[in-house]
Amino acid sequence: RNIKVSLQDLDFSTKNGYVKGIENIFIKQLEDLKPTERPIHCSDKKRLQFYVKDDDTWKKDEDHEKLTESIKAVSNIQVKKMTVWEKQNPDYTKDPQKSYKWSKMLDSVIAGENSQEVKKNEKKIKKILGKVVDIKEELKGN
């Protein structure tokens, strides 16, 4: 499914940071879908065991390869969305307030300063998503 990112999402990330921003985007997209339509489910939120629907087939996401790929994709979409903001604020390089906002935005869409920080942030996102797409909770609700 194509993930959409709005300027409001980018603003949310700027105010709340990378992890909360990515969580917000995923959760908004998933909440729009019925549990049976979601492309991802978590069968064990403690061990973070995810199943991903790929080419109409459910597959165990062994090393979180697909989920990590999706997190990076959302981050990249946010970076691209910054260009929309830049076009709407062409004076951002000259206006100190806008320049500051731009740098805060950039900080909020980058996963981390090093691979250790990136992995730590990805794990936080996966834990939250595990709770959101927990198939056991969904089955209890029906």
Each model region followed by its residue ranges:
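Extended amphipathic coiled-coil helices
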Residues: 1-142
